[in-house]
Amino acid sequence: MKIPKEGDFITIQSYKHDGNLHRTWRDTMVLKTNENSIIGVNDHTLVTESDDRRWVTREPAIVYFHKKFWFNIIAMIREEGVSYYCNLASPFVLDNEALKYIDYDLDVKVFKDGEKKLLDVEEYERHRRNMHYPKEIDHILKENVKILVDWINNEKGPFSKEYVEIWYNRYHQLKK
């Protein structure tokens, strides 16, 4: 697939390690692309679960995907402030169908007050055993949790004060 341009809409698909489709987001607006990353926005975006349940995102969210890091970041913009949901996941690939990645269950939630919480550890351990995650994947994911926490603590990239404001403003310029 050609690299999407600013203002294009793409589909995002997350898979599980066993190859099963996990979740699909329709019509994510691309805000920026470069050779390693894609920044987009979901705003009342249709999400389809693997069991065909559908729901629509409630608030705008700036999404960040990278080709080298094993996580993606969702900055959820709410009236009371910005919170983050970070998925430990494979680097993304892009094909003619969608931006795709493998979701590895572990998540880091960052609350608007900066508190961090590691989520779904039991689900990760269960899937690691049942889907036979290689030891290399387990090691890579644990190292990427450390990188992610460093980004959070040092307000790097998507966690900087300006990031959400810059990209949310850009979204409003593009949607006119």
Curated annotation (Swiss-Prot):
The active site annotation covers 23
The protein's superkingdom reads Bacteria
> What keywords sit in the KW lines?
Hydrolase, Magnesium, Metal-binding
- Summarize where Mg(2+) 2 binds, as residue positions: 105, 107, 120, 123
Positions of Mg(2+) 1 binding: 87, 103, 107
Catalytic activities: a ribonucleoside 5'-triphosphate + H2O = a ribonucleoside 5'-diphosphate + phosphate + H(+); a ribonucleoside 5'-diphosphate + H2O = a ribonucleoside 5'-phosphate + phosphate + H(+)
Q: Which cofactor does it need?
A: Mg(2+)
Cite the InterPro entries for this sequence: DUF402, FomD-like_sf, Ntdp-like, SA1684
- Reported EC number(s) for this entry are 3.6.1.15, 3.6.1.6
EC main group: hydrolase
| Keyword Magnesium recorded | yes
A molecular function annotated in GO for this UniProt entry is: ribonucleoside triphosphate phosphatase activity
Protein task = Has nucleoside phosphatase activity towards nucleoside triphosphates and nucleoside diphosphates.
Tell me the protein family, please. Belongs to the Ntdp family.
Q: What is this protein called?
A: Nucleoside triphosphate/diphosphate phosphatase
Species assigned in the record: Lactococcus lactis subsp. cremoris (strain MG1363)
